C-alpha cells in the first residue's frame, strides 16, 4: 500500500500516537496494509487509498492520488453496466449499510483530500453529493430515534400495501421447494426451429443496437429482408442542427440566465467539498472497527462483502430526496440524456415496424437502473421500477412520430415489434404496455415483446396484462442460464438489505413484493432459458447438459411458481458476486450477460436443429431409395411383358 511520506518517516513514538488515534486506524507492522484495531480493513485493489497522518494537533485522512491499475478486474455490480469503485470508495460502502454517530462529535477535525487531476469533476461531485445527502438523511432519522435504538428493534411498517378486497398483486409463492435437475427438467420444453429462428434474428438486432453508427442498411436487407428507418443518433443530430439554427436566427430570443444565480449555484456545488465526504470514510472506518465479527483473514470476496458492494451503489440513489429524484426523472426523459440508444427497422413483407433498444451502456442507464423504487404504472395499482419507467416515458415520446407515421401508412395492417437487451428489454416492455394502455395502438397490432437478459420491473405484472386484455404470451423473456441481471430484482433479498431500503425510502415499507416475497419485482410473461455450450459457460445444475433453448412451461403437470423463483435464486446474485471469477472482461458476470453470447447461443441451437433436419432427411432418403429402385425394376418387367403380348398379337 502506498503510504504518505509523513507517515513513512514517523518515529516509534509517533507510531504509538497513531495507534491511539480516535478514528481507530493504525498502521500495520509490515507497512503493506492499513488495518483496524481489533478487526481490520483490507483495501480492494480498485479503491482509493486511505492514509492516516499524525500531526501536532491535527487528525487527518488522506486519499492518495495514485490510482492502482487492475487490468483483469473491474468493479461489476448486479447490473450489466460497470461502475468504478473509485466513485464509491470501499470504506464508504460499509457506511451505506449502517450508521455510526460516534464521529459526529468530531465535526471540527480537519480532513484533507488530495484530488486526482485526471478524474472528471462531474464524477467526483456525483458520489460526494450522494454521500452528503445520505449523511443528512441519516442525521434527520437519528434525531427522531431514541439514543440507544437497535437496528433489529426498529419499527418498520411491513404491511403489504395492497387493497384486501382486490387481492394481493404479489402472490408469487415462496422460494421453498425441493427442486433439482430431475424435477425442474420435467417443466422444460425445447423451442421449435421456427421460434428459435425468430429469436435468433431479434437477438442479432439487439446486439446490433450497441453499434448503431456501424449499421449498414444493405446488410439488413440482404441478411433479413429488413429496411433501416432511423435511430436515436439521427434524432439527436437533427435536434442539434435545429438548435444551432435557432441560435443563429437573429429573431430568436435566447433564454437569459442570471450570472449571479449561476455563480451562486457553482459556489454551492463547491461547498459540497470532498473533505466532508471523507468524514464519512472516517465514520465508516470507525464502524468497521466496532464490528467484532469482521475477520481480516477471511477472503474479501465472501458473500457478506459482495452483498455490501452490491447494495451500496443502490443505496446512494434510494436515499436521495424527492426533489433530486424529480430532477433525475426529467433528465431520463430528455432526448440528449436518454439512458439508451435505439434504432427502427421495417419488415415490408409483414408491415411490421421493429423498435430495438440498446441495453445499459452509459451513466444515464446507470441512473435508470439504480433509481429502482416502486411507483404506480399509468395510474393503476400495479407497481413498476420508477427509474426505468421514467426513462420509458422519454423514449415513448421519441417513438411517437415513427408509430403514427407507420399507422397512417399501413392502417389496420400495421404491426409493431419491440425488443431489447438488458435495460433495453425492460424499456421495450414498458413502452409497449404504455402504447396499449393509452389507446394509441391496439393489442392486436402488437407482436409479443421479446427481451434478452432483462431485469423484471413489475410487481404484479400479470394484473396489468389482464387489465389490457393480454395473456402471458405477450411477453417473452429470454435469459441465459446463469445471467445475473434477470435475477437482480427478482432474487431473495436478505433481511438486512430490505431493512436498509425501508429505512431510507418510505415507498419500500409498503412494497408488497418486498414484504411478502422478499424481492423487488416479480417475473412476468413466458420465460425462456438459454444454455450455451459448455465451452462458453458451465452447465446449470438443474438443466440437461448441452446447448439448448427451453420454455419454462407452466401448463406442465407439477408446475409451480416456486420453480421459477427457485431457479432465479440458483445461483443467487450474491453467490455469483462472491467469486473472484465473476469480475473483469473475462468474468462470469459479463460472459453470461453479453449480448454477443446470446446471439451465439441461439445460433448454436439453430445449428443443432439444422443438423437434425439434415440427418433425418438422409435417413429418410436412404430408407426410401431401395423402395424406389425396386419399384423401378418391377415397372421395367411389366413394360417388357406388355411388349411381348403386343408383339404376339
UniProtKB/Swiss-Prot annotation:
InterPro entries for this protein: AB_hydrolase_fold, Fungal_lipase-type, PLIP1/2/3
Catalytic residues, chain numbering: 422 (acyl-ester intermediate), 483 (charge relay system), 593 (charge relay system)
Enzymatic reactions: a 1,2-diacyl-sn-glycero-3-phosphocholine + H2O = a 2-acyl-sn-glycero-3-phosphocholine + a fatty acid + H(+); a 1,2-diacyl-3-O-(beta-D-galactosyl)-sn-glycerol + 2 H2O = 3-beta-D-galactosyl-sn-glycerol + 2 a fatty acid + 2 H(+)
Record-level GO BP terms: fatty acid transport; lipid catabolic process; triglyceride biosynthetic process
Protein origin, superkingdom: Eukaryota
A Pfam family of this chain: Lipase_3
GO CC annotation: chloroplast thylakoid; chloroplast thylakoid membrane
Record annotation: effect of changing residue 422 to A: Abolishes lipase activity
Nucleotidyltransferase is among the record's keywords: no
Subcellular location, record wording: Plastid, Chloroplast thylakoid membrane
Additional facts recorded: Plants overexpressing PLIP1 exhibit stunted growth and accumulate anthocyanin under normal growth conditions.
Family per record: Belongs to the AB hydrolase superfamily. Lipase family.
Purpose: Sn-1-specific phospholipase A1 involved in seed oil biosynthesis. Hydrolyzes polyunsaturated acyl groups from a unique chloroplast-specific phosphatidylglycerol (PG) that contains 16:1 delta 3-trans as its second acyl group. The polyunsaturated acyl groups released by PLIP1 are exported from the chloroplast, reincorporated into phosphatidylcholine (PC), and ultimately enter seed triacylglycerol (TAG). In vitro, possesses broad substrate specificity.
Protein name: Phospholipase A1 PLIP1, chloroplastic
Organism listed in the record: Arabidopsis thaliana
Source species taxonomy: Eukaryota, Viridiplantae, Streptophyta, Embryophyta, Tracheophyta
